[in-house]
Amino acid sequence: MVKMSVARAFALGFVGVVISAGFARAQEDFPFEHELLLDAHPMKGSKRIPILTVEPDGTATIDLWCNSMQAQINVKGEAISISAGEKGSQSCAPERQQADDDLAAALVAVTSWRWDGENLLLIGPKTLRFRQQTN
């Protein structure tokens, strides 16, 4: 009876470790194919918040404060690099255009990423916090 209880406890413990390891691994994976919203308030007079969407092949669409931008993102472990591509030419208020330029510059300066709870941190000279969009 005692041997059976020890064996059962060991089996349950092993299953728990396997499930925990799988969950931890899932938490570490980069969130390809998810819309990631910049953790920021909309600018005055707008409801728009920047959104980052990255495909598994690294192509990305970044909706900035006014325009959108194409990019190529390379993820290797915790390292990440972002190469900016074409940016839209929609006319914007000067402060929104400046915010686009500032965010684009911060994104291309990112060198690593990690999860902080439910938030994705893109880390460079300036840390950018994104959260997965939930509907």
Where does each model-flagged region fall?
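Lipid interaction determinants
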Residues: 2-12, 20-135
